[in-house]
Curated annotation (Swiss-Prot):
Protein name: Cytochrome P450 monooxygenase 208
Family matches, as Pfam families: p450
Keywords: Heme, Iron, Membrane, Metal-binding, Monooxygenase, Oxidoreductase, Transmembrane, Transmembrane helix
Positions with a binding annotation for heme: C438
This protein's record includes keyword Iron: yes
Gene3D superfamilies: Cytochrome P450
Membrane topology note: Single-pass membrane protein
Alphabetical list of CDD domains matching this protein: CYP64-like
Biochemical pathway: Secondary metabolite biosynthesis
Amino acid sequence: MSRLFLVLDTGAAVLLVALLFVVYRGRQSARGPLPPGPRGWPLVGNVFDMPSTNEWNTYMSWGEKWGDIVSVTLFGQHIVILNSVQHAYDMFEKKSNIYSDRPVITMAGEMVGWDRTLAVLRYGKRFRETRKLFSQLIGTRNHAERFSHHLEHEVHQFLRRVLREPTSLLKEVRKTTGAVILKMAYGYEVQEGDDPLVDLVDRAVEEFSISTRPGAFLVDTLPVLRHVPAWIPGAGWKKKAQVWADDLEMTCNVPYAFTQQQMSAGTAIPSFTSAHLESNPDPEQEILIKNAAASLYSAGADTTVSAVSTFFLAMTCYPEAQRKAQAEIDAVIGNDRLPTLADRDKLPYVTALCWEVLRWQPVVPLGFPHCPVKDDIHAGYLIPKGTLVSPNIWKFLHDPDTYANPFDFEPERFIASPGKTAEKDPRQIVFGFGRRICPGMYLADASLFISCAMSLAVFDISKVVRDGKVIEPVIDYTSGTISHPRPFECSIKPRSANAEVLITAMHETREK
C-alpha cells in the first residue's frame, strides 16, 4: 500500500510540475514570446549550441537566420544577443532605467572579486559614486588631456625601446600601456626591463578577460557549484579562482599603498589616486577610491594593448593607409619634432585611422552583458528580468548597411568629401551604451591617438621578408572579453636617419 501511495505521490508531483510549467509558459506567452533562436534541449537548453571561440561570428550567423534579436537559454538562464545597434540604443539608452544593471557573475564577481570594479559592479549607489570619481578627473576630453604629458613621455620611451629592439614590439606595447595607466592611476613610474608591478597587474587583467567570458565557467550558469569542494576531480577551477582572487587583491592594494607612502613622504607624482586622497576621505570612501583606481587599470590597460597591437597589424597589412597618414604628419608637423595631443585636430586622416583601428577589430567584440531589473517587452518580444543582454559589437561595426566594405581597413570612410558623407563614428559603439558607457573613453581615445601618431612619424612598418620571401601576417584574434591579435611578425625600421636622431635626441634631452 505504501508503495502505491508513493507512486501516486510521485505521479501527482510530476503532474503538478507539468501544470506549473504550462501555467508559466501560458503567462509568458500572454506577456509576449521570447525572441527566436536555436532550439534547445530540455533542462540544459542551448548548452550544446554555444560557440567556444569567436562567439561574435556565431551570433552574427544566428542573426542572419533568426533576426536582430536572438535568444538562447543555458540551464534556465535567458541570454539575448543583439545584432542591431539600433536595438542597443533603444534598450540601453532610451530604457536605461531598466537595462543599466549587470548580472551576477559567480566566477569573476563573487569568487574572484571583480564585482568591486566598475565594469562588473551592479547598478546602484556604489556604481554612481565610482563613476563620479572618474568624471571629476577624466570625464571630458579636456580633463583627459591634462594627462597628456604622462602619455607623451611614456610613448617617447616606447619609441626608444622599439628602436633598440623591434622584435619585442608586442612586449613593449604591453609595458608602455601599463606604464601609462600606473602613472596616471597611482603616480608609479615603471622600472627599466621587467617591472614586477606591471607583471602583476597584467596577469590580473588577463585573468579578468578569461573569467568574465560568457560560458567559460559552468558555475556562472549553476551558481550552486561554488559550494563544491576544491579537491573533487574536475573542480580545479575553484583553485584557479582563489589564485586569481589573490592576484586581484594585490593588484588593488600594492599600488594603492605605494601612492599613500609617496604622499606621506611628500614625493607623490600627481595621479588619480593622490588627487582623491588629498581630501582626507573617510575609510568607506577610501575603499571606493581604491577600487576605482583598480577599475581604471583593469578597464584601460588591456583594451589599449589590444588597440595599439591592432594598429601595428593594420599598418603591416595596409601600407597605403600608412603612407597617407605619414604624408599628413610630414605636411602638418614636419620632421623636426613629434606629434602631440595638441596636434590632433590638425591631423584628420591620422584621427580617422585611429577610429578605423577601433572599428576594424574591436577590442571587446561582444559587449559586456546588461541585465534588466524587470520584465520588458521590446520589439514585441518578452525580455524577462535577469536576462543577460549582450550587444554584438563586432556585428554592429561590420554591418554593410552602416560601413561600406566592412572587412577592409579604410580610414577614408570617416572623412566627408563632395557627394560622400562620413560613415558612423565607431566610438559611439565601441565604448558602450547608456549609463554603462566607458568613463575612460576620452583617455583611451587620447592614448591610442598619440601612440599611433608618434609611431607613424618615425617608423616604417611593413611585412617581414625572410630569405627573399614575404611573410604574410595572419589576421587572427583571441577569444575572451578582451580580444587580442595573436602574435604576428612585422618589420619596424626608422623612416630616416633624422627620425632615428629625433628619438635618441629626445631621450638624451630628458636625461639631462
